[in-house]
Structures are given as structure tokens and as C-alpha cells.
Amino acid sequence: MGKFEVLDHPLIQHKLTLIRDKHCSTKEFREIVNEISTLMAYEVSRDMPLMDVEIETPIGKSIQKQISGKKVAIVPILRAGLGMVDGMAELLPVARIGHIGMYRDEETLKPTEYFVKLPSDISERQVFVVDPMLATGGSAIMAVDALKKRGAKDIRFCSLVAAPEGVKALQEAHPDIDIYTAALDEKLNEDGYIVPGLGDAGDRLFGTK
């Protein structure tokens, strides 16, 4: 079974409270999501493999640690996932960026895939799938399906807010992946929104309704 972890760093929790507030402007929401994503990148990359390298400091030669060259990809689920890309890429600047397009049918709450564009060597990369909300889990499951179909093996899912129902569904569908979130909220309401949640992340990021 993959790992499930709530990232409870004080800075992450503080900033998450700011964007939950309905009075948070689009500009502020976008900036803070970016900041949280950078902090999350630090946490979710803790186990990246290291190797010994010989360097020369101004004083002399030394054996030190360096990331071993594991390739990374950041794959947002469109469109809300785009808000998390730049923040994660701040700490992982050599990451390739893929995209998976999904939209949710407001009647059935089921996701539909409409676009997939990934690095050609996705099977060799550690993949961070990003989406601010893990609600029903439908979009996350379909995104991981699409990645595995194209050869991805090392997959981690990163969200800002998750519902227990979504976590359970994703774990049951893909028990091998790790799931990280900044908050595990109470439940889904009858409209499929996370309670208390933060509203529609895509609309709040892009100023649409």
C-alpha cells in the first residue's frame, strides 16, 4: 500500500487557512497556492535518492551528497492543477511538465478526459500529479490510469485539500501510489464539493464562475 500523508507544516497550514477564506482575492489565492506548492515540493521530495560526489571547496577536496539524477515530471490535472505547477517547479527546476485535461460533468460528477500530453520518457520519471482538490477521486483515478497506460511507474498524487471519500477511492483504485495533501477535510456534500474545503479551486485561481 502506498503512503498517505497530511503535510502539517505550520507554514502550509497557515497559508491554507488564508486561501480557505472566501474573501481571499483571485490574486492572493493564486500567489498563496503557488507558495503552498513550493512548500509541498520540499516535503514530497524528501526521499529523492542521493549519491556521493567529489567536489573541491575553497579549502580542499571533499565527498558530498547530490541528488542522483532521478528524472522528475510534474503533471497537473487541468485546469486547477496549473496553479500548483510553478510553485513545485521552483524547487524542481529540471522537471518536465506534462498535462492531463479533465472536466467534471456537473450532473453525474464523473470526469471526462479530453487531453493528455506527457514527456516521451515518462516511464523513467518520478511523476508528481498535482490537483488542488481530491474530492470524489474520479479525476485522480483517471489521471493515474492515463499515466500508467503510457508507462509511468513511480507516481505521487499531491493535493491541497482532500475528502476521505476521494482518498479511499484513489487508494482502492491505485494502492501502489503515494498520496500527499495539506488537509484531510470532513466529507463531500451532495454536490460533490469538499466540506469545509475552499470552493472551486479553478474558479478561484482564474477568476471565473
Curated annotation (Swiss-Prot):
Belongs to the UPRTase family. NCBIfam families: PRK00129.1 (NF001097), upp (TIGR01091). Its EC number is 2.4.2.9. Allosterically activated by GTP. Gene3D superfamilies: 3.40.50.2020. GO terms for molecular function: GTP binding; magnesium ion binding; uracil phosphoribosyltransferase activity. Catalyzes the conversion of uracil and 5-phospho-alpha-D-ribose 1-diphosphate (PRPP) to UMP and diphosphate. It comes from the Bacteria. It comes from Pediococcus pentosaceus (strain ATCC 25745 / CCUG 21536 / LMG 10740 / 183-1w). Binds 1 Mg(2+) ion per subunit. The magnesium is bound as Mg-PRPP. Uracil binds at residues 194, 199-201. The lineage of its organism: Bacteria, Bacillati, Bacillota, Bacilli, Lactobacillales. Transmembrane segments: none annotated. The keyword Glycosyltransferase applies. One of its GO terms (biological process) is uracil salvage. It catalyses: UMP + diphosphate = 5-phospho-alpha-D-ribose 1-diphosphate + uracil. Pathway: Pyrimidine metabolism; UMP biosynthesis via salvage pathway; UMP from uracil: step 1/1. InterPro entries: PRibTrfase_dom, PRTase-like, Upp_B, UPRTase/APRTase, Ura_phspho_trans. Coiled coil: none annotated. Pfam families: UPRTase (PF14681). 5-phospho-alpha-D-ribose 1-diphosphate binds at residues 79, 104, 131-139, 200. CDD domains: PRTases_typeI. This is Uracil phosphoribosyltransferase.
